[in-house]
Amino acid sequence: PPLEEATKEGAKGPANVPPDASGIDLSTLETKNLSLLYFDPVQTYLTPYIARAFENALIFHQKTFNWTPWDRTTLLLKDFGDYGNAAARSSPNNAVLLDVAPLSVSMETFTPGERFFTLTNHELAHVATMDVWNKRDARWRRFLRGKPMPIQEHPESILWNYLATPRNAVPRWYLEGSAVFFETWMAGGLGRAQGAYDEMVFRAKVRDGDKFYSPLGLESEGTAVDFQVGVNDYLYGTRFFSWLGLTYGPKKVVEWLGRDEASKPFYAAQFRQVFNRKLDDAWNAWIGFERDFQKAQLAKLSAYPLTEVTHLSPIGLGSISRGFVDAKTNSLVAAFRYPGTIGFVGTMDLASGKLRKLQEIKGMMLYKVTSLAFEPATRKAYYTEDNYAFRDLMEIDVDTGRKRMLLRDARIGDLVVNPADKTIWGIRHQNGFATIVRIPLPYAGFNQVHTFDYGLTPFDLDISPDGTQIAASMGEIDGKQSVRVWTTESLLSGNGPQEIARLDLPPSTPESFTFTPDGKGLVGTAYYTGVSNVFTFDIATRKYEVVSNASTGFFRPMPQPDGSLLVYEYTGAGLTPSRIVPQKRDDLGTVEFLGARLIKTHPELKEWGVGSPAKIDLDPLITERGKYRPTKRMKLAAAYPIIEGYQGSYSPGYYFHFEDPMQFSQFDATISVSPFNNLPKRERLHVGLKYKTLN
């Protein structure tokens, strides 16, 4: 049967929504607590589940914080990027933005559970911890006619914002750490507070003598010069909240985040009131605990012989894409992203570690940098740009550095070249679905080979040397992860993938599995013991072996002709290209997760599990379905005193702001007077009007 085809410009029509969102046509699903906005018909299938997940999470947060939301939450579904993300706010109104695209779980940096369940629990934790209020806050919100946002034109708005929503004025580690803490225990322990990646980060810091940031240093240096940039807020915040929960108990954590009548508005003052110590003192105590905790884990791992590692680079290189060894130049072809440089496609000499930049990457990712494939015969590499938007497919000559765009906005990643016929295969994300695609020569368009059901998300695609088999890691809706091997013929036939082998290593996510040079097996990594080690998998026998014992973690192994493996070892400075000799291991050390110690010490956290959203009877909760008309939903969102200046004189006045919940239509009115100098009467009254729309 013919395969669905798309042109160089990508698919057209309602399924491909332009990222500028001009002329938006949104449908709505309304309940008492939720206004869910979405694009019909391509996102309609998601709305019942997401609405249930929202109501499910809301019940938990209302009970936990004794919180009544100040206003209804507006939730917007969007598909403006190829990887999922989310955002939340409580000022000027409660709102959540959710991308429908699959999330990147590279190196288990995100929870492999059902994404909307996890994201909704996480984002509503943000809304709750920022919107919590007591009688004092309520008085200010009524006086200010809402929860004013800080705006540049009127610096006084910073004060009004703090008085109305004091818990909006908090550092990001506070927001993300608390949200990950709740996300994990609301899911019964499946989350980053029990994540192997987080453990590895701090284990590597201790092993390598890397610095720990203070709360102030984290928000300045830690999110600017460290390769993980803003993700450090998640990492540090989550560890600190977990330590607080372990040391003082979950109830104290909730008390700190809450806003009862006796609480302090400023988060640090509230911390001292709840824990009877300064925040900085507690932070330092956590760092001392973390060092001792990780030293104990390193000792457990070294009880068994550790794999000897030869670093091929003199420094850690932050994030590195999938790499390929170019035998002609004895170099590693990959994409690199580390502090002080824009991510680039380049090469690293395997003898000296010297880097050669070929081209900078527009729209690089954090951990993956880009999706990269290499064809040594033609000296061409293929990679993606605009990785957080609609991805473009690029071609680059690894000898000259010349590049050209092959497909614009194709939304394709996880690239691999089929050695048999030089077609490029990849995985395309659109409308929440993942599709395996094939790009034939001359790479002017692509064929959609197979679209997986919602909840099935393949990644880390690879093709056997003879082109007859395809392998990919696969995430399922229930959080299970595996590596699957299919015949290429079954995919091309249109009858669906025919599975010939599967590797499960629960509860870890097997990733970066690639075919061995003889095509009979796969080699990749997994946190099977809590540490990311290298595994080999025999396709015929379906048996696996672990061939390394890492103290931090190994990633993206590449078999070499001499039997060694090129791997990326995780260090305090990120990934470092290295060489190891694989050796079968029958015994490995395991590590204790901080989250595991927390739940063992405080089993009451088991009661935080919110269960499946399926238990929410949604139909009786729906109050309306229709279209979102921004102008009809505009209302007064804030009104507060201001001070302006006119010809050297003070001009007291008032600012009024009207908007719809998504801020698609906004109207501002500023009225002030200048009564304190000898101005003509016609110049004493000042009125400024401004209307803004998306267009």
Residue ranges and their predicted role:
Residues K328-N330, A377-R379, A420-K422, D466-T468, ...:
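Short coil/turn segments that connect the beta-strands within blades of beta-propeller domains
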Residues H61, P166-A196, F202-R277:
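Active-site-proximal alpha-helical
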Residues A299, F336, A526, T576, ...:
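Outer-membrane beta-barrel initiation region
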Residues T307-P314, K354-K362, R402-L407, G445-T451, ...:
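A short beta-strand motif characteristic of beta-propeller blades
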Residues P2-T165, P171, G188, T223-D226:
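Juxtacatalytic substrate-recognition/specificity segment
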Residues R192, L317, A335-G346, K362-Y367, ...:
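A flexible loop/linker signature enriched in serine peptidases of the S9 family
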Residues P2-P19, D25-E30, F227-N232, E255-F374, ...:
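Beta/coil-rich, acidic/histidine-enriched accessory regions frequently appended to metallopeptidases
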Residues D349-G353, D397-G401, P440-A444, T488-L492, ...:
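Short loop/turn segments that connect beta-strands within beta-propeller blades
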